[in-house]
Every structure is written in C-alpha cells, then in structure tokens.
Design a protein with these regions (language model features):
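N-terminal short secondary-structure element
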Residues: 1-31, 36
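Secondary-structure junction motif
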Residues: 178-179, 193-214, 280-289, 295-308
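A late-sequence structural motif
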Residues: 107, 258-301
Length: 316
C-alpha cells in the first residue's frame, strides 16, 4: 500500500469515478490508475469499487470505509509536511489565497495591505477561479484560504467563516428609461437585455431565484466571470448589467449609473474557507482575523481542527 493508491481512491470519489479525470488530477495515466486500484484490491483482498464492466459506478461498503481512512491518512501526511514549517519559521513563507475576481479586485486590497504590514516577509499568491475551482484547490492543499460567495459554506471537507454580506446593483447608462422607475421592479428589468455573472459565481443563483419566484424569464444575453467584463459590455450598449454592489469603480463607470436592487434580490455572504483538520501557520489564522474582527484566532483554530471524519461525504 502506498500514498499514490490512497490518493487515487480519494480522487475517484471526488471525480464521480471517472478514471480519466482522476488521471488528469494526479498527473498520471489512466492505465496507471487502473493498475494501482487492482494492486490495492489484491493486497487487501476486497473489492473497493462497484463495477459494470470496466466502468466504476460507486464504492462498496468496504470501499466507503477505506475512503474515510484514506482521507484521514492523507490529511495527516499533509500536516506532517507542514509541521516543520510551523515550528521553524512562523513569520515568513507563502500565503496562497484562492478567490473570485470580484473579491480579489474589490474586497481584498485593504486586508492584504494590513496583512503585509504585520507580516512583511510573507509572500502572497492570489489564484482567481470559480467557487468550484477554489474548493478543489483547498481540498488538494494547493491553497491555504478560499474566498467566495458560493459553494464553500456547504462543503463538509471545509470550515467556512462569514466575512461580509453584499447585495447586487443594476448598471445602466445615464439616460436609460429604468432610471425613471421608482421603485425598480423585476418586471421592468426583465424587459431589457441583461448582462450578469455566469452560473455558479457571485450570487448568480440569487438572481435566477428572484426571477423564478415571480414567474419571469430574464433575457440574459451575455454572462461573464467578473464585474469588469460586465461593465465593459454595458458601456458598449449591449444591455443592462447586474453586478456585485462592492464592484464600484469611478473610471469604468463614468458613463453609467447604479440603481439599487436590494429590495429585489437576496443578499449574498462572502465566506472564508479552510480545509478541515489541516495545520496552518499563524499568519493564516491572523489573515482570517483581519477579515472578520469578530473571529478570534483561538476560535478559528478550534473549528478548523475539530475531528470531522464522519462528516465526509462524496455522494457515495
């Protein structure tokens, strides 16, 4: 038995038993993945996966039990690698933050500035992605902290702390007819071509839910991953734009006006996520404390390091 075999078991569950995706995630070949699975099953004398021909459909009962153990072993192995750093150098290193464009561009600058004043020898790496990509980076230990409005708070492998709540607002040209409607309604917005975020990011689900509750179908002609792209196409006259309220910027909005839509769409929460049970350097805890003064380092540590093996659920 070896770590690669355990990684394959864990990744198979994460990738819905698609061995091609498992091989891609672990930078190996599909034949190599299949060989490792066969060798581990032969060594243990059990069937780990439910099969139909060569296709994996799920996990057997022994396989489910093995998955929980594999997750614990791999997480502890990661902690061992971090242990030396924790005790030898706690004021320098690299802090990797996986976040969405909106948070990287509009919410994090002041926090990062304050963090650098406290830890001038820590280098920061910002990785921008979707909430799903951010969660995967946390799962794999490729990011220390994940920041997003979607996905992080309902992942049993992660611990998520609230940062702040934010609403959407509507961007339109100064002379647009919607500027004359008070209060703004979903019915009036639905009459115009709409530009907003793509599925799965920056509160898009709140937008879709609001229109669905009214039995309306928004005419979303263009969806994008970040606010700046949305603003660009609104400025070109392609449509009106629904964006995060905190994404304001005078230069890119000089020919646009923002309209309040807090009464139309539910507010969103930005979450700070960490991998459950993973040791961290002190500056990781302090970064979270800078984001949310209501959190103490002791409380963050306690929640992150709580035993949660029974909560791991890969939909098996």
């Amino acid at each position: 038995m070896n770590f690669q075999q355990l990684k394959i078991i864990r990744e198979a569950a994460r990738q819905d038993y698609n061995l091609t995706e498992v091989a891609n995630m672990l930078f190996t070949s599909q034949s190599g993945v299949s060989r490792h699975i066969r060798e581990l099953e032969d060594e243990l004398g059990i069937e780990i996966f439910v099969r139909r021909g060569k296709r994996l459909l799920g996990m057997t009962e022994p396989g489910k039990a093995l998955l929980v153990i594999a997750e614990r072993i791999l997480n502890e192995a990661s902690n061992v690698r971090r242990l030396a750093d924790l005790f030898t150098n706690d004021t320098s290193g690299v802090l990797t933050i996986a976040t969405t464009h909106t948070q990287a561009r509009y919410s994090l600058p002041e926090v990062i500035k304050a963090f650098r004043e406290l830890f001038p020898e820590v280098r920061l790496e910002l990785i921008q992605g979707t909430p799903q990509e951010i969660a995967t980076l946390l799962h794999n230990g490729e990011a220390d902290i994940g920041i997003a409005s979607e996905r992080l708070s309902n992942d049993p492998q992660l611990v998520a702390f609230p940062w702040f709540r934010w609403p959407h607002s509507l961007l339109v040209p100064h002379d647009h007819p919607l500027t004359q409607i008070t209060p703004l309604t979903l019915e009036s917005i639905a009459k115009w071509p709409l530009i907003t975020y793509r599925q799965g990011i920056t509160g898009r689900s709140r937008i879709d839910d609001a229109f669905a509750r009214k039995g309306l179908l928004a005419d979303i002609i263009l969806s994008a991953q970040d606010s700046d792209v949305i603003k660009t196409y609104v400025a070109l006259g392609l449509g009106i734009g629904l964006v995060a309220e905190q994404s304001s910027g005078e230069q890119e909005e000089k020919n646009l006006i923002r309209l309040d839509t807090r009464h139309l769409f539910d507010a969103n929460t930005v979450w700070l996520g960490l991998k459950r049970g993973q040791l961290q350097r002190n500056y990781v805890w302090r970064f979270l404390e800078l984001c949310n003064a209501g959190l103490s380092v002791e409380d963050i540590k306690r929640q992150v390091m709580e035993n949660s093996e029974e909560e791991i659920d890969y939909q098996i």
